[in-house]
Amino acid sequence: MNNIILLPQAQRVNNIEDAVILDEFKAENHFIEANTQEVTFEHLKNDCITPVFAKDNELTINHADFIETIEDATRTFFHSQKVGTPNIRVSHVIKGRIPEAVRKPASQLLDSDKTIYYERAAFSIDIPTVFETIMGNKLNLSIVGVRAYNQMNLYSKKSPELFRLAIGFKNQVCCNMCIFTDGYKEDLRVTSTNELYRAALELFNSFNPARQLQLLHSLGNTTMNEHQFCQILGKMRLYQCLPNYYQRNIPKMLLTDTQINSVAKAYINDENFSSFGEDINMWKFYNLLTGANKSSYIDSFLDRSLNTTQIALGINAALHGDEKYRWFIS
């Protein structure tokens, strides 16, 4: 790990083991696909209304404020690094009308008559000067945030609002996200942008990228043959059908049948990670999983990102004799 620098030295002296910086920022591809579309920050800020809590008409923290707050925290914490602009993806558009246009035919509506906001939004912010190369793939440090109004009760009075925030590494070959437990807040509840800002700084400060990169590097040292690969995919398909009492004794697996099928197709056809007809190393297997996860809806994307990491590392350990994930290879 000769290329990674880590976090501001004043705050993270003990965790900075290897370091180096220097690279040019590249335009990124989609980190999530599914049914999302790309939008600009200006569109969210200027063209979208802000939902409220129905019982007291108190404002929610809208998507633009969420993104702006995390970007500010990122630029503050990584003040000596180059920070990219947010790449924003949204889904599930909610359309409405202003009161004056309630009785207008749809064909006669003006843009000024319409209202719009998005139920779900996700964004990523790359820090390209903090990077590492694994198996020839460049990984940039990246912050990812997710907001989904469908996971909140907007029909009540104002209460703490749910956000998801992660810091990890993005594979620049394919924009697959590598997320670990210590870099993920899955249940971040706040009532203001000030609380959100502080929570982001706390997450960045507790993050230990050297440990993550060590584990990711280890995946390249293990291979499995085609029979083992097919065995694992079969067990992953079987997992979906197991009764609850049986599933409780097996590590969680969140990928859907469709995503498992995508892993199988990518094993044959993917331009970066296909291994059809030969042994596949666990780094490639991991990227087949994270690639399939890009088809997740926004509200389940980060949970599945973490789960794909756990599965890849768990199966890697099982191939070396560990018992926890042994069911998937036995």
Name each region found by the language model.
Residues 1-71, 77-82, 86-90:
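Feature for intrinsically disordered/low-complexity regulatory segments and propeptides
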Residues 76-115, 119-122:
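A short acidic/basic microdomain associated with nuclease active sites
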Residues 1-25, 105-330:
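Intrinsically disordered, low-complexity regions enriched in serine/threonine
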